[in-house]
């Protein structure tokens, strides 16, 4: 009976008594690992759908509700900082580099992953605005979670990433609260992981070099500047994996910096005052030339197919155009390259 009374009294005192002054202590770990040890993640995406974010279906992260014990009106927020180099951005959020091929999106915040702040840059930033505990004991936690990002065009491959330091979160006392000598900063490292990256693309069924014979015309068929006459036509055909949307860019092989819609004639041409324009299908607007690159969003890139087409094709029409410089008859030769982007 006496022993029971002592236990009951101890519990009663712990519950009933208020904390009359601000207190804080560190009860976490200064070094923390993010994600499972030796994680392995797999995904499939179109070859040029980059940067490609791995959505693993769960959070690759670290969370701990008990990093600091606080009480007695102590006010605390959190700041976060990423130490990895910024190699790009996606929807306003920094992409941080791990290797040449693999990057990270990073979120930091309090214990709840869903309230994490999307990190940008390499400066300290507010990741949890904070709160003031009442006259009782409680805890302050934190969380970090990441998503891998494929950065570069490649064939299907496996990428291994070694353990890497990410950055830090620090406790930020405010409203007169002070941490004193208490540990305020904790560090994070990403555990090693492997990405099994499968890419989808297309195969060109048309020969890689296509010669279009241009019809002979008279100068009288192009009487005014801007007048056009059909010179020739050809088609491009591909066989694609399911879900691939094909985009294409025409590049002027003679003048690669050309961004107009008139193809430069080669040095072998003897005619002057005439140029070539290229149209696709039934479009009334000619295609413009752009850089020789498969990068998503390349200048003057145009959509050739949708993701529902596995055997896409495009009909191309080449037209003579009067450039307004006075036509002198002769031969006309032009070279354009096509670069496909599988998105």
From Swiss-Prot:
Cellular compartments annotated: Fimbrium
Main location: other
Record GO cellular component, one term: pilus
Disulfide cross-links: 75-132
Protein's GO biological process: adhesion of symbiont to host; cell adhesion involved in single-species biofilm formation
PANTHER family: FIMBRIAL SUBUNIT ELFA-RELATED, TYPE 1 FIMBRIN D-MANNOSE SPECIFIC ADHESIN
Family assignment from sequence similarity: Belongs to the fimbrial protein family.
Name listed for the protein in its UniProt record: F17b-G fimbrial adhesin
Organism: Escherichia coli
Lineage per the UniProt record: Bacteria, Pseudomonadati, Pseudomonadota, Gammaproteobacteria, Enterobacterales
């Amino acid at each position: 009976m006496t022993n029971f009374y002592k236990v009951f009294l101890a519990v009663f005192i712990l519950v009933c008594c208020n904390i009359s002054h601000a207190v804080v202590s560190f009860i976490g770990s200064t070094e923390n690992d993010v994600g499972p040890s030796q994680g392995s993640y797999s995904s499939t995406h179109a070859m040029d759908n980059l940067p490609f974010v791995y959505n693993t279906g769960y959070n690759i992260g670290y969370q701990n509700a008990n990093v600091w014990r606080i009480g007695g009106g102590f006010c605390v927020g959190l700041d976060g900082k990423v130490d990895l180099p910024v190699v790009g951005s996606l929807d306003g959020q920094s992409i941080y580099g791990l290797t040449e091929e693999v990057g990270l999106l990073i979120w930091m915040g309090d214990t709840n992953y869903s309230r994490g702040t999307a990190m940008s840059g390499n400066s300290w930033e507010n990741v949890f605005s904070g709160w003031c505990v009442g006259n009782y004991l409680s805890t302050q936690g934190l969380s970090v979670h990441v998503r891998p990002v494929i950065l570069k065009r490649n064939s299907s491959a496996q990428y291994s990433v070694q353990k890497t330091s990410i950055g830090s979160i620090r406790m930020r006392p405010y409203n007169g609260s002070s941490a004193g000598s208490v540990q305020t900063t904790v560090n994070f490292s990403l555990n090693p992981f492997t990405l099994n990256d499968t890419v989808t693309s297309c195969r060109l069924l048309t020969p890689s070099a296509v010669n279009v014979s241009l019809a002979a015309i008279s100068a009288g068929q192009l009487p005014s500047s801007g007048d056009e006459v059909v010179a020739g036509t050809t088609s491009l055909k591909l066989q694609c994996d399911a879900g691939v949307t094909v985009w294409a860019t025409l590049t002027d092989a003679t003048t690669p910096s050309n961004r107009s819609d008139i193809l430069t004639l080669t040095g072998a041409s003897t005619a002057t005052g005439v140029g070539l324009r290229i149209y696709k299908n039934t479009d009334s607007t000619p295609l413009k030339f752009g850089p020789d690159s498969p990068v998503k969003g390349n200048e003057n890139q145009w959509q050739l197919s949708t993701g529902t087409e596995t055997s896409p094709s495009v009909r191309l029409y080449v037209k003579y155009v009067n450039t307004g410089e006075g036509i002198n008859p002769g031969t006309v030769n032009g070279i354009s390259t096509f670069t496909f982007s599988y998105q």
